[in-house]
Amino acid sequence: MNVKVFRVSGYFEKNGRKFKFTKEYRALKEEHVKELVYSDIGSKHKVKRRKIFIKEIKEIRPEEAEDIVVRRLSLEL
């Protein structure tokens, strides 16, 4: 199995305001990335899943990753 790097962008609503986000994750499938986004944003910002809106999930090359931890973990292999 090959671990891929994904960039996720979207927004979430909290107290009537919208907050944009862009995150990068390593995962096997897009479905795993969705769960990671819901879990991560939901726990950090105390937001329900129905208030998190994912606009785009895009597979990127490890060299394109802006998150230094994701990039280093991907390029070590």
Swiss-Prot record:
Alphabetic keyword roster: Ribonucleoprotein, Ribosomal protein, RNA-binding, rRNA-binding
InterPro entries: Ribosomal_eL20, Ribosomal_eL20_dom
The keyword RNA-binding is annotated on this UniProt entry: yes
Domain of life: Archaea
A GO biological-process term: translation
UniProt key word Cytoplasm: no
GO CC list: ribonucleoprotein complex; ribosome
Pfam families: Ribosomal_L18A (PF01775)
GO molecular function, one term: structural constituent of ribosome
Subunit structure: Part of the 50S ribosomal subunit. Binds 23S rRNA.
HAMAP family: Ribosomal_eL20
Family assignment from sequence similarity: Belongs to the eukaryotic ribosomal protein eL20 family.
Name of protein: Large ribosomal subunit protein eL20
Organism: Pyrococcus abyssi (strain GE5 / Orsay)
